[in-house]
Amino acid sequence: MHTPVPRLHRFPGRPALLAALLPLALACSQTRDTSHDACPPEAPALATGGAPHALKTVFVIVMENQDWSDVAGSPSAPYVNGTLLPAFAHALDYRTGGLHPSLGNYVWLEAGDPLGIHFDAPPADVPLPVTCHLATYLEDVGLTWKAYAEGISGDTCPLVNEGKYAVRHDPFVYFEDVSGRPFDPHSARCIAHVRPFEELASDLAAGTVPRYAFIVPDVCDDGHDACPPLNDPVGQQDAFLAREVPAIMDSAAYRDGGVILIVWDEGHRGDHPIGLIAVSPLAKPGYAAPGAYTHGSTVRTVQEILGVTPLLRTAATSASLSDLFTAYP
């Protein structure tokens, strides 16, 4: 005789059980792997010896969520294709290993590794006790840095989304040595270094721009969202770059060994190549670098230009972007 198999929906407690398990499942999906948190045994130091560096000041601008094939040759990006690519160098094979979504990629650009983050969350949900990351390395050896973020007031440490400011695109505030333990919106270190984007122009004009400047556009200018009047993420990115890159290029900091690294955080289809453009008086004009690169390459390049050791995590095993320049570092 056939005995019917009971169906789950016949159990009256099933909805309550699912409701109880859902928070646990979400918590597990947002648990980061801490196995890469360890710091190198060496203390941060400035490299000594050798010739003076040709490259001296680094600006990083991060764009959002486009494969390179969506940007290269696109009629929505006339500034990138008609001005930047003919005059400067770019990478053909820059990838993130298929890492999604945003936060892990931004942390990678600061710490040399995603630090086990494969989800988006505010700092309160993913505090990073790690002390070996670029900002702290630079301060430890006496070099200056700032993040310039659109849409923040500068009166507090911007630990939550606000208007068009996305906190997940601002990696510095996730580190407890920057934002406090527990996180503190009044953290003096954070407020001193994470500044409104508008201050970049005055710092450039006054000659007080830091040696390392990380630029955080809002979710319209970085192309994360489709925003009016263009309603075209690639077009929005291009318009922002066309407006802001020339302003940086007009500064003494750029003319005297400056480099602007324009990088996309991730693609939107698996692990296809994403964009990396090196804008500098010392970039190879019109050059398309064939090498394989990652966010670890960007971190390595920043460290080598600024002369800061030891190399952070994947920066130690990634190729630098030296091939994109006529003189390096």
For the regions a protein language model found, what residue spans apply to each?
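N-terminal secretory signal peptides that target proteins for export/translocation
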Residues: 1-12
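Sec-dependent N-terminal signal peptides
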Residues: 18-23
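N-terminal pro-sequences and low-complexity stem/linker regions of secreted or lumenal proteins
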Residues: 30, 36-329
